[in-house]
Amino acid sequence: MKVYCLLLVFLVGLVSQAHGRLDKRCMTVCTMEYWPVCGSDGKTYPNKCHLTSTACTSQKDITVLHVGKC
């Protein structure tokens, strides 16, 4: 029983650590410059940085369709 508890604690720690790395990789500080881009999800983003940040944090493949509003 102790072995299972230790294994569970280890696995929870491992998953938490992996989740923390994902969040850090996605943290992006974007400027407030307004150079709108249209994303492949049909949304207009203030600039490419905001689109990239959203794609990373949502874990979706969002690309720039064109420069300007959708």
Swiss-Prot record:
UniProt cross-references to InterPro entries, sorted A to Z: Kazal_dom, Kazal_dom_sf, Prot_Inhib_GrowthFact_Antg
Tissue: Expressed by the venom duct.
GO molecular-function term, one example from the UniProt record: ion channel regulator activity
GO CC entries: extracellular region
Kazal-like domain span: 21-70
Subcellular location: Secreted
GO-annotated biological processes: cell differentiation
Signal listed as a keyword: yes
Paired cysteines (S-S): C26-C56, C30-C49, C38-C70
Signal sequence residues: 1-20
Keywords: Disulfide bond, Ion channel impairing toxin, Neurotoxin, Protease inhibitor, Secreted, Serine protease inhibitor, Signal, Toxin
UniProt-listed SMART domains: KAZAL
Domain commentary: The cysteine framework is IX (C-C-C-C-C-C).
Cited function: Acts as a neurotoxin by inhibiting an ion channel. May also act as a serine protease inhibitor, since it possess the kazal serine protease inhibitor signature.
Name under which the protein is recorded: Turripeptide Gli9.1
Source species: Gemmula lisajoni (Gem-turris)
